[in-house]
């Protein structure tokens, strides 16, 4: 009877042992992998650090995966040390040959030689603007004509070079009297930052103010000369009037003397 009871206990204990083994929590629960290793010219976005999770590396922009290499890595457990780690990927990222051939070439500098801009004339009929000065390879001419009764009319080219200003004045009251003054100003302003005026701008203002002062001075001198002439004219007129008044008196006295002589002869 005793051996039969022992065999029955063993038969009942085996399923219970299997059940306990199945219900026992696994030893690997809660184990996670550290951050994966870095690969040159590639990035990785890890979605899960748990065991047996798989992730893939992605090559950066301008690079592509080399043929024969793999971007796959997996979180595995080292049973000897009971430590989880990522498998080493064989990925190698190389430059994309298609993008290398499509790289744009640097812009080349083109220099145009012997170009002389033609200034446009907006002056009234009968007035000739000043001629533009010759330009070199890297400089251009800026011509401005100042005509009495009109505004400043500049003719500008892409780069600042020589500036010429001519002022022509004509007098309609007196015949053939023309006063012309020319100023030539040279200013080297090849590269001027925006918002900064070149040196020729201030020189032009000085030249215009100088011409205005000279014209005012000439006008004052002419007015003074006319005033002096007008003051000298009345005395001459008075002398002529006195001479004219003296002539009849002399003629009257001479005729009286002749009459007296004739009367004396008759007597």
Swiss-Prot record:
What name does UniProt use for this protein? Interleukin-15 receptor subunit alpha
* Residue positions with a glycan: 137
The UniProt PTM text for this protein says: N-glycosylated and O-glycosylated.
Any one GO MF annotation of this record: protein kinase binding
Q: Record's SUPFAM superfamilies?
A: Complement control module/SCR domain (SSF57535)
User: From what organism does this protein derive?
Assistant: Homo sapiens (Human)
Record's keyword terms, sorted: Cytoplasmic vesicle, Disulfide bond, Endoplasmic reticulum, Glycoprotein, Golgi apparatus, Membrane, Nucleus, Phosphoprotein, Receptor, Secreted, Signal, Sushi, Transmembrane, Transmembrane helix
Q: How does it sit in the membrane?
A: Single-pass type I membrane protein
Q: How does it assemble?
A: The interleukin-15 receptor IL15R is a heterotrimer of IL15RA, IL2RB and IL2RG. IL15RA also self-associates. Interacts with SYK.
Topological domains (Extracellular): residue ranges? 31-205
- Transmembrane portions of the chain: 206-228
